[in-house]
């Protein structure tokens, strides 16, 4: 990615007669902005609400991936809240049957948001929980199924097979990877690992309010060709905002 930006910068300077330092700074800044905009535009996100509403068949199934600690549970709750505000009903599948208290955390949010939740036994089959949630959505005419999954800190072969099985059985319309923007290179490694072993369609970045620049967005767009569709900017339910490339570029150069 840095090679592309430097090449663009070099091309923008070739043949230019510049007399003042201010002019050089402006040319460099404009070139950098243009390069970043091109990277983001090629992998622009999409409007999930429109995507769901345009799909004729119910339910729209979304599976969430992410290691422990990235804010996956809270992100699912925020997305459920956002969908509800847009007149879209949802049901949550607590398919993390591995981590202690995972289902209780989702149950807390589901109760506060007045959204149905399907739970399973700890140590039980995550795919079965997800399957039950989809069937429940069909019988109750619910628009969207939000499927939580296990995410151990050190992703292993057993977890990969478990997640693959969830995907195989649920046939999701969308696979979202949740990443912590503060994790830097670790987040990028997680993104590569999930892409190489399971696959996903889009990213939600959390804790962006605490991240100075959010450079991982560029790496995701350029290296992995994955769009960031939402940003988590706080702990409240309404602290989930669509990713805006213009806002991101301004933030980099402020």
How would you label these PLM feature ranges?
Residues 150-152:
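Short glycine-rich anion-binding loops that position phosphate/pyrophosphate groups of nucleotides
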Residues 1-95, 102-122, 130-138, 143-147:
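Primarily NTPase-proximal linker/entry elements flanking Walker-type ATP/GTP-binding cores
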Residues 105, 125-140, 154-254:
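Conserved catalytic-core segment of NTP-binding enzymes
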């Amino acid at each position: 990615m840095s090679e592309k930006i430097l090449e663009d910068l070099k091309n923008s300077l070739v043949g230019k007669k510049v007399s003042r330092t201010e002019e050089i700074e402006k040319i460099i800044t404009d070139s950098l902005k243009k390069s970043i905009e091109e990277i983001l535009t090629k992998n622009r996100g999409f409007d999930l609400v429109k995507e769901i509403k345009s799909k004729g068949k119910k339910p729209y199934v979304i599976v969430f991936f992410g290691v422990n600690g990235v804010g996956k549970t809270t992100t699912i709750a925020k997305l459920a809240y956002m969908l509800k505000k847009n007149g879209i009903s949802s049901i949550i599948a607590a398919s993390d049957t591995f981590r202690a208290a995972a289902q209780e955390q989702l149950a807390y949010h589901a109760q506060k948001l007045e959204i149905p939740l399907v739970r399973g036994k700890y140590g039980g089959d995550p795919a079965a929980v997800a399957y039950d949630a989809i069937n429940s959505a069909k019988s109750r005419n619910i628009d969207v199924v939000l499927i939580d999954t296990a995410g151990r800190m050190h992703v292993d072969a057993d977890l990969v097979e478990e997640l693959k099985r969830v995907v195989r059985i649920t046939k999701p319309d969308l696979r979202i990877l949740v990443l912590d923007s503060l994790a830097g290179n670790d987040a990028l490694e997680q993104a590569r690992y999930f892409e190489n072993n399971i696959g996903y369609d889009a990213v939600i970045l959390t804790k962006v309010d605490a991240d100075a620049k959010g450079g991982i967005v560029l790496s995701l767009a350029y290296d992995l060709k994955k769009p960031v569709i939402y940003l988590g900017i706080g702990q409240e339910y309404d602290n989930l905002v669509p990713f805006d490339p213009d806002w991101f570029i301004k933030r980099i150069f402020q």
